[in-house]
Design a protein with these regions (language model features):
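Conserved phosphate/ATP/ADP-binding segment of small-molecule kinases
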Residues: 112-186
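Short, small-residue alpha-helix embedded
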Residues: 136, 200-229
């Protein structure tokens, strides 16, 4: 196993961003209601084309025409879960990359059951969660009290590696330092700011951004690494000029728009 050391990671991230701007990939998001507006605006900010369809009557058709699918467990409902599975199976058949955010997966048996079905039937390309969510998914233990992790990322690195191998996917563990692995390779993202955790939908936005990078980069670990790097850089820059949560949200969108500005 080895850590991914990339001297020109920002340059490579910008190569992906340039491809996103040129190709304007269609990213199908089935995310929670709280996050939909911010996720869509963030994807537009980097040049992607978001669509937020969730009706089971159309999700298969839309996913089949999309360049990536982003699924989110944030506000689980039986109808939404069914839509996610239908969309995921359609994407899988077309070999369209899928990123699945296992929000609060350890909080209830309902969430764990939905997550297990999506993983079993849709085989996500990337699974994303904070430390406690990834630990819960690995152990199938219920009892996590919230969706914010108070564990350090390093505590679940070994579990993330094992889970990545077991599920043949990329695992993204978010935290003060983000950890990305395919079970063999590892990458760390040190950028970011604590203010990001005070703005709702930041995590859901990261999931959508990962989807956009997956649409243009065929290496899912590299795509996830670059996406989280972009989130972190934009977050740091936004925080440096923000007075509170409101300005942080607006500044973050502006900084996503301006990630290519220093070229």
């Amino acid at each position: 196993m080895g850590t991914v050391y990339i001297n020109n990671v920002v340059k490579q991230m910008k190569t992906d961003l340039r491809l996103i701007q040129e190709q304007q990939p269609l990213i199908h998001n089935i995310t929670n209601y709280v996050a939909m507006n911010f996720v869509a605006n963030s994807l537009l900010a980097i040049g992607a084309s978001p669509i937020m369809a969730r009706a089971e009557e159309e999700v298969e058709e839309i996913s089949s025409k999309s360049n990536a699918l982003a699924l989110n467990l944030g506000v689980p409902e039986s109808t939404t879960a069914h839509s996610m599975i239908l969309a995921g199976e359609a994407a899988m058949k077309k070999r369209i990359p899928i990123v699945f955010d296992v929000v609060g997966v350890g909080a209830t048996r309902f969430r764990m059951d939905i997550a297990s079905q999506i993983i079993l039937r849709c085989h996500p390309t990337v699974i994303k969660g904070n430390a406690s969510e990834i630990q819960a998914l690995y152990s199938h233990q219920i009892g996590m009290l919230g969706v914010d992790s108070h564990q350090e990322t390093y505590e679940v690195e070994e579990q993330a590696k094992k889970l990545a191998k077991q599920l043949s996917c990329i695992i993204v563990v978010t935290g003060a330092i983000d950890f990305i692995t395919d079970g063999e390779r590892m990458a760390y993202v040190h950028e970011g700011h604590s203010m990001m955790s005070k703005v709702t939908a930041m995590g859901c936005t990261a999931t959508g951004i990962v989807g956009a990078f997956l649409a243009v980069n065929s290496d899912p670990l590299e795509a996830s690494f670059h996406a989280m790097k972009a989130m972190g850089i934009a977050g740091e820059r936004a925080a440096s000029q923000s007075r509170g949560n409101g300005s942080m949200m607006i500044n973050f969108l502006d900084e996503l728009c301006n990630l290519m500005a220093d070229d």
